[in-house]
């Protein structure tokens, strides 16, 4: 009886071992040959990029497409603002600086913005300092070499909001 138990146990152990080898040989590491840059991580053979990076291997800063001199065409009601404005690198990979030419030289100082993928956001700020009577905030979306903007310039006192829309190319 002991001998039958030993044979049955050995057979079961052999089948289990063969099954484990067969299973692991069929499950290849999809990330084995994938190299993700800039702290990206590989999941199922595809790089998941860290914030601020994009591309197949996370090789490109997301803000790169925004960094240039743009020809701007903004509208506020019946008024058309046509001007040139530059966007440059900010302090980290998600930040950019918009030159003071923004909104046809409305502000004396630069404007800080953040980039997340194809979206550029101007968080609410007073570019000309706390003694200035004006604030700005807004969002733009990048597509096919253009940024479509909606931004608001707010006069603090007396209170008034001016919503601008525009296309930069």
PLM features per residue range, with description:
Residues 62-82, 98-99:
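Tryptophan-anchored aromatic micro-motifs
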Residues 1-26:
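Sec-dependent bacterial lipoprotein signal peptides
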Residues 40-51:
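Extracellular cysteine-rich, disulfide-stabilized repeat modules
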Residues 29-39:
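Disulfide-braced loops of extracellular cysteine-rich modules
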Residues 73-77, 114-169:
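Beta-sheet ligand-binding and adhesion/scaffold domains
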Residues 27-31, 58-67:
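Short domain-boundary/entry signatures in modular proteins, especially
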Residues 39-42, 83-91, 109-117, 137-144:
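Short, exposed beta-strand/loop patches in secreted or surface proteins that constitute
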């Amino acid at each position: 009886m002991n001998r039958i138990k030993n044979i049955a146990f050995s057979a079961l152990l052999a089948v289990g071992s063969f099954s484990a080898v067969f299973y692991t040989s069929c499950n290849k590491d999809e990330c084995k040959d994938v190299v993700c840059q800039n702290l990206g991580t590989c999941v199922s053979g595809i790089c998941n990029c860290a914030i601020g990076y994009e591309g197949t291997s996370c090789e490109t800063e997301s803000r790169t497409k925004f960094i240039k001199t743009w020809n701007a065409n903004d509208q506020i009601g019946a008024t058309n603002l046509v001007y040139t404005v530059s966007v440059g690198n900010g302090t980290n990979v998600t930040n950019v600086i918009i030159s003071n030419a923004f909104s046809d030289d409305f502000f004396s100082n630069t404007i800080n913005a953040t980039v997340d993928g194809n979206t550029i956001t101007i968080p609410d700020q007073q570019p000309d300092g706390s003694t200035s009577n004006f604030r700005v905030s807004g969002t733009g979306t990048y597509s096919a070499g253009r940024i479509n903007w909606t931004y608001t310039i707010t006069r603090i006192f007396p209170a008034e909001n001016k919503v601008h829309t525009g296309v930069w190319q």
